[in-house]
Amino acid sequence: MARTTPIARYRNIGISAHIDAGKTTTTERILFYTGVNHKIGEVHDGAATMDWMEQEQERGITITSAATTAFWSGMAKQYEPHRINIIDTPGHVDFTIEVERSMRVLDGAVMVYCAVGGVQPQSETVWRQANKYKVPRIAFVNKMDRMGANFLKVVGQIKTRLGANPVPLQLAIGAEEGFTGVVDLVKMKAINWNDADQGVTFEYEDIPADMQDLADEWHQNLIESAAEASEELMEKYLGGEELTEEEIKQALRQRVLNNEIILVTCGSAFKNKGVQAMLDAVIDYLPSPVDVPAINGILDDGKDTPAERHASDDEPFSALAFKIATDPFVGNLTFFRVYSGVVNSGDTVLNSVKTARERFGRIVQMHANKREEIKEVRAGDIAAAIGLKDVTTGDTLCDPENPIILERMEFPEPVISIAVEPKTKADQEKMGLALGRLAKEDPSFRVWTDEESNQTIIAGMGELHLDIIVDRMKREFNVEANVGKPQVAYREAIRAKVTDIEGKHAKQSGGRGQYGHVVIDMYPLEPGSNPKGYEFINDIKGGVIPGEYIPAVDKGIQEQLKSGPLAGYPVVDLGVRLHFGSYHDVDSSELAFKLAASIAFKEGFKKAKPVLLEPIMKVEVETPEENTGDVIGDLSRRRGMLKGQESEVTGVKIHAEVPLSEMFGYATQLRSLTKGRASYTMEFLKYDDAPNNVAQAVIEARGK
């Protein structure tokens, strides 16, 4: 089967935004204008097509990033049909993992900002993730029809808060109730969309006289940004020659692809204005799979030899599984992005991370939660496979003859955990299956059994994250659960270096004895300097401990890290240097050295100024001005560090850093302090030393 759309006409894009910036409505309009969706779904009445899980419709927030395919030939039908694969990404802090995961497989992104709220804390998180994966992006300033809408203010915030270089492609004509259309700064024409057909048709008109000066000024800014793309254009521009529309677009495209500028468009998705021109900008300025660098990976040859795959049908098949979802009718859906080659339904592929073969039974392309079965997928495609047995997020699927492991994704450690138990004993097994399924879908969610209490513990990125997991167990698996009080994921660390700590395990009880003896130094590592949070250096000279016992020493210490001596929490940022010891020809064994190492570790840890670390959250509260004092007072009582505040149209925005343990039940308290008028966002920032009194209380509560 030949390719229907050339790969240069593909756009794999994500649409990402802060909660309530109007991203779902924007996506809905895209689906409407691209002709997929004939009745526009509104989030306000829970009918949006992309939000396909029930809780999303109830809460009006987008949780699962669904992948949808649409076609676009331009507002004025000026292009050949382009295939746009849209990954919808959530805007709520607790679902940052979904954003990270979709950023990994995108080629470009549209950042949606609210014209009133501007750049919000979650926008900064998403921005950092897009930077990490070097995703070229454009911005869409939405909700221009709302009270307090201000396009150029948001452009300023993109510069100051995100450190980006925003270049407006348009200006808004009017604002709030008076918002009627946009000025196209490339063509220097006003665009007015037709309300009668929900903005499907439009007219180019002259720029309103009272906006001509402003339009000239920003047109100049656009031309200068384009001219900076190359020396030839700069010479042409400085020589007073006009740049053609084609030259301007090509130059801006080049700079967007190089991540040098962010082109900014605006509109009101709700009022059917602006999304159409933003789609044109996606085609004009965002990359196709062939415009982005080849994907890097390593060969599965035991040597981790670097390799790459180019976006071409002629290269061996390689794809990355970026999301697992459970579908009530067909079971497991594995969403994957094809980076190279072609695969047909019925083909056998290799999961190179797990070295297991998988058969592609059925392949479907998703339109939100409707699916269309297809026979093959090619480089650049995003699709879902039904019935893969053992594939997890981040696994590589590839041609068995040409194995490669594509870059793995990194997932954050959970910061909050709660105990769960089924309401009826009979549901115990069902609950285990449900939690296993959900953990497979979401790598930032963990499940384990507490060895001491035998309780099932679930852990995630925040209270809302865990609420939704419990909710999904009830809806999708029919398991009702009781949940315990949230527990904070503390950590333990040391603050001083200790040297020559001895650990000796010697036993003689008739017959063969046990003998292991080690001498170690322990030292703190700079937080975040080592991804594992642990390093082991073997400095044994002259064979005082034979080489075969060294891994046992390392293992003995690593086993102790899982449950630290202070309060049984994991130990992080620790370095160990093994430099002396002794052994016995007959009595020494791996077990004896493992035990000797654990004795030395416990001894050294006590002497190395041990501390308890607590998770600190970055909290931003938006409150009416008259409640500012109360809100700040309350944050201080919660051991919050005030980091600053600024005035907004809607009130005051307060920035603080607060320990997670003090934030439980904050939503309720904030509601009563401000009569429900304030809102807040919270995301994990860092681990920091807990004050003595807090640490003492935690240690006593753990019975250590």
UniProtKB/Swiss-Prot annotation:
Keywords: Cytoplasm, Elongation factor, GTP-binding, Nucleotide-binding, Protein biosynthesis
GO function terms (MF aspect): GTP binding; GTPase activity; guanosine tetraphosphate binding; translation elongation factor activity
PROSITE patterns registered for this protein in UniProt: G_TR_1, G_TR_2
GO CC field: cytoplasm
Residues involved in GTP binding: 17-24, 88-92, 142-145
Localization terms from the record: Cytoplasm
Keyword Cytoplasm in annotation: yes
Pfam family, one: GTP_EFTU
Family: Belongs to the TRAFAC class translation factor GTPase superfamily. Classic translation factor GTPase family. EF-G/EF-2 subfamily.
Full protein name: Elongation factor G
Gene responsible for this protein: fusA
